[in-house]
């Protein structure tokens, strides 16, 4: 290895890396700020303009886009015609390229960033050099990640060159990196143009964790996250205690966070297998947790609990009495953390809460991807329609709205029975609505008397209304829209219960 081209925006570790290259007899070529950093550190360096014999221009937009650079990168060392061609133009081969790109992602995440600022942080020369070097990985080593500096230096010290396998691996990493970089730029500009569903979609995610296994032990799995910070997201969670999250932990935690984010008042949400098993609302977080626990003392065991307020010592004492896989909250008091951390297997996570989840959801299908807007429609309760002779009381309406927030997160067909303070029965995932209703009502038992019922979609028949009325339900909330709405309304009137239509469906598959 004789010549290296180094141009980086992230200068961590680059000076000692270059110093070692010089010790190994490698000539360093560099540009702009990187060249200045080398000169300041006393590292011998050749300026890019001395290689191209052409000055930087257009405020630095054109520096390395030159045959003297790309010819030195792309020439095949095993092809005589290539080597003769570059020699004829006095172009020398470049054996190592170390480049990382303008910080486009960091720029667009800044508050108040302008389009002009974003555009100026789109790197052109950097990706071009990386791609040229990566294409010719048979002869050229290309580094885009500071984590690979040591590997390259070790191989150079031991063998005088990098191995083919290392060059191939680094080239693959470069093409992943430039593809992700371009995807971020495309997404940013697409959002500005207002195109919701463009003809092509390229998604970029960063690997956060290789998981022990997936949904089952025979399935390999990893966790990838979107670039940047996503509030209310398990991807942005900070783990304070406990072993690594599993695949199922992550999915359950995501489900719990989505429900907890629906509420501004203190709420505790217990989840098993991506369905809530208990949700409690209170004047404080302790009361909320106790309500969630009382909602289903059996199912909460081994579950995931998300709370939207800081966990205090009293709440922690209650939670420490049972086995919980994960507790998620905005924060834990020092006393609460000390209490819960005594249980070595529990995972404690903090997540920034900021209202209900918005944006788009992506679901893979065999051979494709479904993308839809998140079910975060802002509903105006003033547009809800009372269609029965009996009007819901103020207390019933409060309970109906609370359970309506919850039922949208239960797998369809979904029925939730509850009060303004807690769920009392949850029927999830049945193939017919009456089946889910009977499960929810049976779970609620005697507590169904005086409670309310929420349904994620309309009643195809009046049997659910009749079953609810016979169990003691006093008010129902549902979207409406069935050709048999009239029959359901008449059944409600027959038993003297109120019914509210939201005109919004919340299927969840």
Curated annotation (Swiss-Prot):
The record, for NCBIfam families, names: PRK00881.1, purH
Gene designation: purH
E.C. numbers: 2.1.2.3, 3.5.4.10
* Keywords, alphabetical: Hydrolase, Multifunctional enzyme, Purine biosynthesis, Transferase
Q: What is this protein called?
A: Bifunctional purine biosynthesis protein PurH
Species of provenance: Listeria monocytogenes serotype 4b (strain CLIP80459)
Is Transferase given among the entry's keywords?
Answer: yes
The MGS-like domain sits at 1-144
BP-aspect Gene Ontology terms: 'de novo' IMP biosynthetic process
SUPFAM superfamilies for this protein:
Cytidine deaminase-like, Methylglyoxal synthase-like
Q: What stretch or stretches form a coiled coil here?
A: none
């Amino acid at each position: 290895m004789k010549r290296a081209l180094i141009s980086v925006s992230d200068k961590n570790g680059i000076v000692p890396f270059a110093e070692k290259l010089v010790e190994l007899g490698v000539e360093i070529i560099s540009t702009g700020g990187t060249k200045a950093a080398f000169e300041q550190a006393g590292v011998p360096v050749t300026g890019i303009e001395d290689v191209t014999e052409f000055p930087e221009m257009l405020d630095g937009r054109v520096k390395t886009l030159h045959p003297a650079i790309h010819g030195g990168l792309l020439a095949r060392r095993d092809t005589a015609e290539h080597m003769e061609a570059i020699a004829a133009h006095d172009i020398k081969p470049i054996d190592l390229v170390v480049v990382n790109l303008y910080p486009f992602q960091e720029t667009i995440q800044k508050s108040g960033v302008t389009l002009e600022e974003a555009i100026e942080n789109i790197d052109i020369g950097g990706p071009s050099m990386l791609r040229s070097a990566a294409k010719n990985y048979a002869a050229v080593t290309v580094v885009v990640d500071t984590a690979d500096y040591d590997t390259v230096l070790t191989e150079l010290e031991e063998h005088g060159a990098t191995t083919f396998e290392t060059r191939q691996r680094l080239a693959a990493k470069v093409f992943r990196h430039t593809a992700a970089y371009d995807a971020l730029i495309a997404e940013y500009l697409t959002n500005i143009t207002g195109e919701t569903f463009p003809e092509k979609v390229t998604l970029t995610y960063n690997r956060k964790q290789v998981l022990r296994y997936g949904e089952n032990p025979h399935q390999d799995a990893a966790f990838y996250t979107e670039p940047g910070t996503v509030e209310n997201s398990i991807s942005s969670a900070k783990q304070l205690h406990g072993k690594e999250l599993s695949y199922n932990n992550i999915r359950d935690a995501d489900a719990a966070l989505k429900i907890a984010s629906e509420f501004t008042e203190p709420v505790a949400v217990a989840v098993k297998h991506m369905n809530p098993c208990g949700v409690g609302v209170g004047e404080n977080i302790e009361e909320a947790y106790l309500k969630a626990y009382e909602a289903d003392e059996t199912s909460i065991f081994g579950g995931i609990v998300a709370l939207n307020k800081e966990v205090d010592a009293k709440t922690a004492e209650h939670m420490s009495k049972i086995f919980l896989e994960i507790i998620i909250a905005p924060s834990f008091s020092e006393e609460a953390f000390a209490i819960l951390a005594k249980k070595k297997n529990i995972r404690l996570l903090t997540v920034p809460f900021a209202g209900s989840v918005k944006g788009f959801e992506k679901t893979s299908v065999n051979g494709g991807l479904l993308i839809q807007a998140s079910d975060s429609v802002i509903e105006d309760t003033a547009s809800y329609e009372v269609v029965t002779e009996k009007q819901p009381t103020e207390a019933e309406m409060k309970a109906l709205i609370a359970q309506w927030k919850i039922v949208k997160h239960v797998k369809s067909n979904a029925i939730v029975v509850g009060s303004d303070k807690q769920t009392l029965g949850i029927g999830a995932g049945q193939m017919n609505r009456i089946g889910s209703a009977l499960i929810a009502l049976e779970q609620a038992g005697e507590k169904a008397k005086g409670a309310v019922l929420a349904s994620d979609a309309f009643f195809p028949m009046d049997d659910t209304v009749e079953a609810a009325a016979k169990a003691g339900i006093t008010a129902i909330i549902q979207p409406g829209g069935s050709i048999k709405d009239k029959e359901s309304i008449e059944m409600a009137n027959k038993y003297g219960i109120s019914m509210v239509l939201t005109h919004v469906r919340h299927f969840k598959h």
